[in-house]
UniProtKB/Swiss-Prot annotation:
Belongs to the bacterial ribosomal protein bL9 family. Gene3D superfamilies: Ribosomal protein L9, C-terminal domain, Ribosomal protein L9, N-terminal domain. GO terms for biological process: translation. Binds to the 23S rRNA. The gene is rplI. SUPFAM superfamilies: L9 N-domain-like (SSF55658), Ribosomal protein L9 C-domain (SSF55653). One of its GO terms (cellular component) is ribosome. This is Large ribosomal subunit protein bL9. It comes from Campylobacter curvus (strain 525.92). It comes from the Bacteria. Keywords: Ribonucleoprotein, Ribosomal protein, RNA-binding, rRNA-binding.
């Protein structure tokens, strides 16, 4: 019997492969545990259509992330913080503040977990480069200008 693997099976193959197996193994184990489906022409056609749809969605998502990367790379985000008597900042600029300012000033929503700041970063007035990990191995460099008020 021919089966279409839905999930990776250690001794048999990877998801998406069509394999010839014994009837009992195919029906009782693979199909029974949801690891495979009987490889009928309809099942194969549906699987290929679903794979094509996933690829198109992935391309669309990556193109949107590339656009966001380009937008973020052009922005210099200005964040004003209160200065102490000696001219240093009270505290530091946090990921949350960067994400909130991006949304407020530029209407761009970025998850605060995607923003990477070093421990000793953004604790003084100045211009900084901050990495924003967008997903699918795409990251952008955002310029953050910390100013005192």
């Amino acid at each position: 019997m021919k089966v279409l693997l839905i999930k990776d099976v250690k001794s048999l193959g990877k998801a998406g492969e069509i394999k010839e197996v014994k009837d009992g193994y195919g029906n009782n184990f693979l199909i029974g545990k949801g690891l495979a489906k009987a490889a009928t022409p309809d099942v194969i056609r549906q699987y290929e259509a679903a794979q094509k749809r996933k690829e198109e969605e992935l391309k669309y998502e990556i193109s949107n992330l590339e656009k966001l990367k380009d937008e973020l790379s052009k922005i210099t985000l200005v964040i004003k913080k209160t200065l102490g008597a000696n001219g240093s900042l009270f505290g530091s600029v946090s990921k949350e503040e960067i994400a909130e300012e991006l949304e407020k000033a530029h209407h761009l929503i970025v998850d605060k977990k995607a923003i990477e700041i070093d421990k000793n970063h953004l604790k003084a007035v100045g211009l900084y480069d901050v990495q924003v990990k967008l997903g699918h191995a795409i990251s952008a460099t955002l310029k953050v200008d910390v100013q005192g008020e």
